[in-house]
Amino acid sequence: AAVIAGARVGKGVVVVRSPKTGKWNPPAFIKSRQASWGIQAGIQEAELVLLVITNKGLKQLFRTQYSLGEGPQIAIGPVGKTLDLNLDKLLSENDILAYSRVKGLFAGLSFDGTIISSDKHANYEYYQQAVSNRSLLIGKEGINVPESGQAFLKRMNRH
């Protein structure tokens, strides 16, 4: 182990169920960047699920970018469980809950921060028009949803 800097990148989608209609709105594409600094060693792969609990959390998704998980963190391998030492955030009301499943071996003590932002390029490629995450997440009319997106929404709206 050594004192080193680390970085991670990722991509994903966000879908929101409309509180008015109960139906799911079209998916919005996001990307993430994480930087860390500290004593750390290992390699891992992670899957992340964000649950938006409050309207305040939903409004965070409307912003161009927002931060998650800033502060010291201890990661314990090999099962990839994490212990977050940022007690202020743990003890305050949560607007967005993050769950992850991690594979690999990683150990260390590091300071890190994650930034989630709108993936404008992916939105444009998928919808063939410039569309904001806000427009997608609120279900704005006039967005041409591709067939694959319509099939996804049809399946999601069954539940």
Label each residue range with its predicted role.
Residues A1-H159:
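Small-residue-enriched, tightly packed secondary-structure blocks
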